A protein has these predicted regions:
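Chalcogenol-based redox active-site neighborhoods
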Residues: 1-158
Length: 158
């Protein structure tokens, strides 16, 4: 069973999660700002590392365009701290151990994995505007090339 997916134009659900440094981070902390929230299956795995490093390498152009990036996974705070350090990640990584926020955003549910239907994290990205509304809701994205595609959709130059 999959959680309900969010529609463009709806209010982004607020949440509070713990980041890689043990600090509480809420979506409402960024009120009045544009936020990219991306959900990924697991820190340190090949696809997730590719995607995280892609955000890292593009963070300056995204920030110049007014975007804050938040990565969300079901990893522990300790695993996120290790992942951040190993990859030099320059944006907050948030721990959602009980998958509550994944479910709020429809980023957990059934997916095809190597020809089998399994239940797990749906690699997803959301763009929240300054008013707190969903402007983009992208589900089942590919790790490789995703940030370039996202930049293009947002009109952000490299």
């Amino acid at each position: 069973m999959s959680a309900a997916k969010l529609d463009v134009g709806t209010r982004a659900p607020d949440f509070t999660l713990t980041d890689q440094d043990g600090a509480s981070v809420s979506l409402s902390d960024f009120a009045g700002s544009k936020v990219i929230i991306y959900f990924y299956p697991a820190a340190g795995t090949p696809g997730c590392t590719t995607q995280a490093c892609d955000f890292r390498d593009n963070i300056n152009s995204l920030k110049s365009a007014g975007y804050q990036v938040l990565g969300v996974s079901k990893d522990t705070v300790a695993d996120l701290k290790k992942f951040q350090g190993e990859q030099g990640l320059n944006f907050p990584l948030l721990s959602d151990l009980d998958l509550a926020v994944h479910n709020l955003y429809g980023a957990y549910g059934e997916k095809n994995l190597y020809g089998k239907t399994v239940t797990g994290v749906l690699r997803s990205t959301f763009v929240v505007d300054e008013a707190g509304d969903i402007r983009l809701a992208l589900y089942n994205v590919k790790a490789t090339g995703h940030v370039a595609s996202l930049r293009k959709k947002l009109g952000v130059d490299a």
